[in-house]
Amino acid sequence: MSCSGRSLMVVGTSSHVGKTLLVTALCRILKKAGKRVAPFKAQNMSLNAYVTPDGKEIAYAQALQAWAAGIPPAVEMNPILLKPQGNLTSQIVLNGVAVGTYRAGEYYERWFAPAWQAVKEALARLQKQYDWILCEGAGSPAEVNLKHRDLANMRVALHLGSPTWLVADIDRGGALAHVVGTLQLLEPEERALIRGIVINKFRGSRELLQPGLDWLENYTGIPVVGVLPWVDWVLPQEDSMGIAANPLLWEDRRDRAGGQALREGRLEIAVVRLPQVANFSDFDPLLAEPTVHLRWVHPGQSLGSPDVVILPGSKTTLNDLFALQKTGLAEQLRQYSGHIVGICGGLQMLGETIADPEGWEGIAGTYSGLGFLPLTTVLQPTKVTQQVQTQSRWPALAPIQGYEIHQGSTQADPSGCLPLFDRENLGWRDPTGRIWGSYLHGLFDNHLWRRQWLNWLRRQKGWDPLPELEGHYAQQREQLLERLADLWQPHLDLGLLME
């Protein structure tokens, strides 16, 4: 069955070729052209998540695309979210609600039919509201061993009868071969939908590339509709594999050019690269701060001497805590005299105990935390997903927006720690402020609070404070989205979308 609305499908020759960023750019380009446009990804596998205004959980990438389109994120934009937990298992989030944890085979056996129904219903609702649906695929559409259960790629395009663009990453090498091979592995009815080829991450002379593009168009009969320049600045990665593929993601280019001298006068913040790190988009506002040097530290590495260490969110808090203990990083943290921060799962690790009475993360039991704050956490099957508005009590009074995504409740001993916010059970600190943690994702997005905290750190070092900022990181994100659209629009043939 084919739906009636207008759509464009974007698939790729492999993962991390730039599908997400292209759909993001197209959302902003069409918005600027006065179109009502919505993003869509049937199934996303990611630990970077966001909570919609009605408390539904979707991939952060689709939230970013919604912001690019100038609309609020909605669960219809990502009806299926798979959150890997290790050992070939994932938590399944269907229509924004967690429905259980399954191995891959179990998931497809039990949930394939209801998941595909959810995809069709989500598309139907979006088509009633928007002029254009920009659909993003996942991985490659040509995985022949997975095609019978592929919910995210050409099954969506065929359902919509959607013209489709195929994206290849030329920076990896072999882009033309990847395009040709992908096309050969598609079924004839799928290949007939491919209306354009996009070459992404191009660096160099277009004149030198042109003979290859001419050959590709002649060989495939499909036009090249875009050659997109390399983007040398950061928008949020879709998942942690993007970080693994690009270990320099957080290495400030000024540092690589100028070395240690240029880091003087900047706070150094080390974020622990947990095995199941989640919601690392929390730290994009810190990355944008010119007076902050942000870096990853892996379990097993030397911690060094940063000003702050952050334990980020985790999909499997206990397993990541065990990784810190086994690799010696937990002991390094105990010997460390700087500031320690925990976000969500990182907050739970900072406490004295974490109980898993029903074995949701493995073997049932109660386990010792890092012991930095007098907190006790009990992991529970019920998942908290909600947006939050509150006010901070420390380091100064400031309005706060953010969102919670966690399974577990935490209780604090008020004789040994203080609340961070007016809202209860959202975050705590020790009496000195050296160690604190919060369940709140998006905390650093709050300009005023972030600058207050950074200035509190700077005063500890005898440095001058930074100017305080009003507003929210969303304003900087808007500038990045505008910049992306302006950069790529001249390099795309948008005739199909502007008709």
Curated annotation (Swiss-Prot):
List the Gene Ontology MF annotations in alphabetical order: ABC-type vitamin B12 transporter activity; ATP hydrolysis activity
Domain GATase cobBQ-type per the UniProt entry, residue ranges: 266-449
| Active-site residues, record numbering mapped to chain | 344 (nucleophile), 441
Alphabetical keyword list = Cobalamin biosynthesis, Glutamine amidotransferase
User: Hey, which pathway is this one from?
Assistant: Cofactor biosynthesis; adenosylcobalamin biosynthesis
Q: Which InterPro entries match?
A: AAA+_ATPase, Class_I_gatase-like, CobQ/CobB/MinD/ParA_Nub-bd_dom, CobQ_GATase1, CobQ_N, CobQ_synth, GATase_3, P-loop_NTPase
Q: Name one GO biological process term.
A: cobalamin biosynthetic process
Q: Which CDD domains match?
A: CobQ_N, GATase1_CobQ
Listed SUPFAM superfamilies: Class I glutamine amidotransferase-like (SSF52317), P-loop containing nucleoside triphosphate hydrolases (SSF52540)
Tell me the Pfam families matching this sequence.
Answer: CbiA (PF01656), GATase_3 (PF07685)
Q: Which NCBIfam families does the protein's record reference?
A: cobQ, PRK00784.1
Homology family = Belongs to the CobB/CobQ family. CobQ subfamily.
Function in brief: Catalyzes amidations at positions B, D, E, and G on adenosylcobyrinic A,C-diamide. NH(2) groups are provided by glutamine, and one molecule of ATP is hydrogenolyzed for each amidation.
Identify this protein by name: Cobyric acid synthase
